[in-house]
């Protein structure tokens, strides 16, 4: 009987490993560790808050990506319910700033259909661009796939990873899904600051120290971000307004575009309290940054 113990232990470990990957939807549970703990990546994140993206912001994105003759762009439109349309307009915006259309690849990836060519292209791209839409749709096709790893490889090796709207939300490890548990009838009007109200799922984890919200000032999402920073006091909560971006390299970032970025911090982690489902806290810090201003992550 003793000879079977090692085999039994292996089976047990495999079983536990599989169970740990099954549920990525959480409220207050800890998410699994992301690929990047400390930002040692050679690449850059170009995170846009959605809305109308100006030609000058696209030009800055292309400049940041430092595209050379043999370099190319990969567009990932899986967040959109109309990926062909999302790809068309993304490609059009790049061509309008003199990017050669032959240097632009589009992959509407499916979780179970990711070719070696597609994965290698993502790894070698100088710019990976994630369109807007629904961040949950995007992650449903990317999480625990070769494409997820390929995006991380590209970023670590020096690529620019860009996204707008939903493509911004996925940059976080703890990703705001947009789902409100307690008041779904409000349809995006975040009227309360309550505990366990906003769904958080696993994102790409390229920006593990912060949680991103987008369309921030225009859609009045302060209550949501306050709830997030109270329940996740170890993270910076960053609200990026429309037509605006943060450009992240290493542990530093700069604001670009036309509007502001709001940063919430909760340094007094032990001050968070709840009463009848309401969230409270003390000494929450807020920064309102203008285009050109820099901050540390």
Segments the model singles out, each with a brief description of its role:
Residues 23-69, 84-89, 94-96, 177, ...:
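C-terminal and late-domain segments of enzyme folds
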Residues 81-124, 137:
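Portal/gating segments that form or line small-molecule/metal binding sites
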Residues 72-78:
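Short internal beta-strands
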Residues 16-17:
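C-terminal motif of bacterial Sec signal peptides marking the signal peptidase cleavage site
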Residues 2-9:
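Sec-dependent signal peptide recognition
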Residues 130-132, 155-176:
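Catalytic nucleophile loop
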Residues 135-145:
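Glycine/threonine-rich flexible loop motifs
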Residues 121, 146-158:
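Catalytic-core regions built around general acid/base machinery
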């Amino acid at each position: 009987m003793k000879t079977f113990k090692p085999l039994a232990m292996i089976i047990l470990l495999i079983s536990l490993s599989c169970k740990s990957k099954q549920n990525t939807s959480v409220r207050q549970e800890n998410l699994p560790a992301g690929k990047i703990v400390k930002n040692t990546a050679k690449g850059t994140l170009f995170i846009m808050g959605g809305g109308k993206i100006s030609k000058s912001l696209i030009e800055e994105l292309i400049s940041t990506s430092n595209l050379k003759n043999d370099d190319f762009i990969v567009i990932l439109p899986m967040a959109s319910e109309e990926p062909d349309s999302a790809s068309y307009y993304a490609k059009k915006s790049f061509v309008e700033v003199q990017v050669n259309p032959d240097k632009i690849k589009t992959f509407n990836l499916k979780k179970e259909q990711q070719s070696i060519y597609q994965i290698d292209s993502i790894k070698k791209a100088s710019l990976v661009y994630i369109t807007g839409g629904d961040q949950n749709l995007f992650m449903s096709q990317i999480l625990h796939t070769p494409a997820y790893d390929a995006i991380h490889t590209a970023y670590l090796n020096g690529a620019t990873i860009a996204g707008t709207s939903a493509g911004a939300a996925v940059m976080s490890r703890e990703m705001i899904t947009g789902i409100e548990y307690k008041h779904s009838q409000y349809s995006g009007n975040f009227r309360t600051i309550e505990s366990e109200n906003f769904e958080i799922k696993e994102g790409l984890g390229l920006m593990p120290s912060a949680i991103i919200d987008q369309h921030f000032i225009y859609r009045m999402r302060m209550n949501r971000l306050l709830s997030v920073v109270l329940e996740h006091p170890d993270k910076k909560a960053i609200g990026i307004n429309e037509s605006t971006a943060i450009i992240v390299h290493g542990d530093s970032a700069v604001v670009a575009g036309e509007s502001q970025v709001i940063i919430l911090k909760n340094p007094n982690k032990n001050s968070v309290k709840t009463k009848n489902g309401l969230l409270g806290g003390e000494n929450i810090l807020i920064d309102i940054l203008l285009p050109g201003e820099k901050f540390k992550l």
